[in-house]
């Protein structure tokens, strides 16, 4: 048989839900929002009872259920509203029957008001504990009709010590006044013991009278004021910082300094006697002088001079001048409006942006050469004198020409294609004095020139043989093979003259080197260039004493028309066969090899699309055509080669010095795999191109890397602390 009733647990007995002052005030707010609550259905206009939502068992009751529709004017709405507090029996066993009847009628009234049914305990423990507590019987008195007051008074006679308190509370509730609930401290929960409503809400006498008036009316529900306390327990118990006070004037502080602090009791007493209060106010006005109202513009509106306001002023207090905003302490008459200053700043920024844009778009060169062009050391490579025959040669080519003094290159003599290398040392032993005398220029003032130790020509021949070369070219066209023999004989005689002149160059070279060694250390590069000094090793290029290794961009001017060169008979056979081959592979091989210094290069990051015509045609300078045959160096004194044999350029043996130490002879008896030789007059079109072809690709690449390293170091040093 299932258990139909279960007693209250220990938790439910010890921790009962007590009706708090806050919950009661919340319930009263419902009545304030809905004034028609509690009226009869006929007063509300309802003519039929509501239908049930679902079929369920409805307990049968006596016809006394109609009492729920009766309205008792003396009972307030708060008496009808039930509390969810479970009632424990607190009366003795002798009065249990009477309480049963009261509870039964109370349940009937609760069903109409849709209030949940309260549980009731029949356990002995709850009876024993609740026998001494009559205060908890308030929940019953809240909902009992007026005709049940007799039974309630009869039950309170048993405990006479609580009669007066109970009657007073009952009368206050019947009148509709708020009653402070009283609880048993032993039954309160831990939360209720710690957080108790310290003070009850004091109701004004006028409000109490208004409540009584509304309670006596039959149809009008009582008016409930806003009894909800909008202050939480946290705000009441844990006070924060005091609110920031508004700034006051000194006059106000002086006037309020003598004001006495009045307690709430005294203040209430003064309010009760308005006549006495008015008299005191009149006396105070007579004694105190009238306060002068200062103009509104001179009053401070509570502005606090904070750190933010001191540091971050409005833009109107700044002046834009010289690209920066400066604070203006005083009013300047010609400062101008704020919009004008903003406009000046925006205009300046836009001008800078346009300048940067034009600076990038207006310069179309390889970015690898930027540091070379802007180098301050370019002045060290200027030509000291332009009185020589090479005055038309650009300074860029002179600076980049690493040949130096042609007499110094003993191992760089050109090998003929048919005979061994017998003329090498003889050419170097020729004096140079005749050359300088013919030109009429002193040796120290001669700029850097291209003197080919391996060539059959000298600089004197370039000046003196120019008309003869043109005449001989015309003779070749007219007479053909008949003139070929004469040219060979004449070339052989000129070759012997060159050998004699080169001996003097060698002697001068030794004197120059001895002078530099006596002074201690190597002479600066510009000084060596003026003296016609030698380039001993690659260190002379990469680590000069003065100026640094400077690589500049090619000249922007159009080079002069190509000179007519003398065509050798042995070159005619090579001209047609290898000319097409060079043009086909010029573009492909130039991209694989490192570019020589001074030769035009393709921009890796072009600003505009480069056409095929812009691709440098000087790439042929670095193009080899055939491998270099290795020839042993011959001792001096051997017979020179025939004059009709053509000379070729050997880029693999470009940087050689007079020092015979093997440490400095890096390229002796070495031949690069892709070093092919070109006819000298066929590979280039003008003087600059001719001289550019004689610049070593290997030395140019090494010097370029060295200069790039130097440029990066300088840039890192300059930008270490940021660009100012």
UniProtKB/Swiss-Prot annotation:
It is found in: Nucleus; Cytoplasm, Cytoskeleton, Microtubule organizing center, Centrosome; Cytoplasm, Cytoskeleton, Microtubule organizing center, Centrosome, Centriole. InterPro entries: MDM1. Its main location: nucleus. One of its GO terms (molecular function) is microtubule binding. Signal peptide: none annotated. The keyword Glycosyltransferase does not apply. A motif (ST]-E-Y-X(3)-F motif 3) lies at residues 232-238. It comes from the Eukaryota. The modification Phosphoserine is found at residues 83, 123, 126, 242, 263, 314, 570, 594, 658. GO terms for cellular component: centriole; centrosome; cytoplasm; microtubule; nucleus. The keyword Cell inner membrane does not apply. A motif (ST]-E-Y-X(3)-F motif 1) lies at residues 9-15. Residues 79-152, 401-573, 626-647 are annotated as: Disordered. Pfam families: MDM1 (PF15501). Disulfide bonds: none annotated. One of its GO terms (biological process) is negative regulation of centriole replication. Residues 138-147 have a biased composition (Polar residues). This is Nuclear protein MDM1. It comes from Pongo abelii (Sumatran orangutan).
